[in-house]
Amino acid sequence: MGYFESPAGHVVRTINEAWAFVPDPLPPTLTWTVGLINDLSAADRVLGELAGLGRNLVNPNLLIRPFMRREAVLSSRIEGTQATLTDLYVYEGEQLSLFEPPPDVQEVHNYVQALEYGLNRLQEFPLSLRLIREIHAHLMEGVRGEEMTPGEFRRRQNCIGPPGCSLGEATYVPPPVPHMHEALDAFERFLYDDAGLPPLVRLGLIHYQFEAIHPFLDGNGRIGRLLLTLLLCAWELLPEPLLYLSAYFEAHRRAYYEHLLAVSQEGAWEQWLRFFLRGVVEQSRDAMVRARRLQDLREGYREQLQVEQTGARLLQVVDLLFDQPLVTVTQVSEVLNVHFASANHYVQQLEEAGILREITGQARNRVYRADEVLAAIEGGGRG
């Protein structure tokens, strides 16, 4: 395995005489090179800009819910799901009789549910092992891997590697169960102790450590990435959950796993932290571009649709599209609490304005998509 001389931990025997890696408790001894300091400074600066944007949002939900769903799609995609953002909106809008999204879309939906649950619970309780288990139960409810004890830490050895590989063939073997519990106790203590370290460095260390402990039989990667968002909010680095790193990890998937593995094998903390901090910079900038694009789109629609009598209701439909870019007339009727005929009139107005497009080609049970909104949420963030 190459872990025998690692400065980041030690190896122990596990079942079938295989070797497993046990990471040392955090924090490690870090070497503060010029490169690491510069990357940290850049990440702090750009994250501060994103926080400023978040504090000045007139309607935070305009961004929070779309960003959350995009993150759910991308974080789940790293684990092999095929569901798209459109699939997720179809699933959430209960338009399943019209479209057949892939079966793994529930996994993506569960990610949204787990993240929302965690953010709500953090308003009452600090992040803890107990809360992490609760979030995992929401993540794994009713999906593949449900037999993998949702909401419970593993009671048997697991490993990371090709499907069906033995422990001896695995790329990485996490701590055996007794060592896992010791590592988790130390992990929880570090959550409450800043150790005099900058918050973003702590965040990078915590993400590695959770991946190294791998305390669940399934869902570890998604929980590890979800924790980043929760801690950014819990530590008040951001006023709203606006920064997500899964797009960066997905775009650099091979480097992501290589850096994590290199910490375990070689103690390559600096390389991992610099990779992580560059992700904070890249995704903070992406979030600001995407946020401004969505805000500009909303303001453009509002200017386009300002009319005397129906203006207020019509603008409510516009705001609905940023939360649910695929809608039916029935949904509009229910959300606005208006008659079907009135909702149909509003939808037709938006279709005539080029804001909505009917996508089924049917005379009944029609579905309308806000193409520009969807493109702004899921498209490239640069520009």
Give the label of every model feature segment:
Residues 1-383:
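FIC/Doc superfamily catalytic core
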